[in-house]
């Protein structure tokens, strides 16, 4: 893969950009403090802004790594305030494969925002980084996340039983993927 670190990406309604130190307040307010958002995630709900600040500081420090891809999701009409997160959370260099994770503030659910963000990252990972495979997974009790993956052309590969863990405990994991040769770019 041709790594180039987290680049600013733009779609019709969104800017996907690097986190900045001051983004912790928006992170806490818009998604990290909401137990409904974190219900099926692998990290706990943030009890205070200090936790969000520490996480944001770690993310900002990692931007010097060319293999680090982590974006703040910004809705253009709202200015520069992050409303969610999308990132490469795992990578297999030999298979040229990346695993994408994402979350979005609850007030922005069911508006096509996460599908737009995921499609933007898929396009970047295939055309710039030249990944061969992009995958993601979700808890079957969170079918809307699978809907995001399907909307972006990802194919359901199967459900691994009791193979994952999230804030609900041990859970099944529904896997989806898309391959570079399944997408046509001009």
Q: Which stretches of residues belong to each language-model region?
A:
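Juxtamembrane helix-loop transition sites at the ends of transmembrane segments
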Residues: 50, 57-60, 174, 179
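Hydrophobic residues in alpha-helical segments
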Residues: 31, 41, 63-64
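A short helix-loop-beta-strand connector motif used in the catalytic cores of GNAT acetyltransferases and
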Residues: 58-72
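Acyl-donor (CoA/ACP) binding surface of acyl/acetyltransferases
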Residues: 1-26, 30-36, 70-186
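Conserved GNAT-fold acetyl-CoA-binding loop/helix
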Residues: 38-58
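Short, conserved alpha-helical segments within structured domains
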Residues: 44-48, 69, 141
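A short hydrophobic/aromatic micro-motif that marks alpha-helical segments and, especially, helix-coil
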Residues: 48-50, 63, 168, 183
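Short, surface-exposed helix-loop/turn micro-motifs enriched in polar/charged residues
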Residues: 43-44, 65, 96
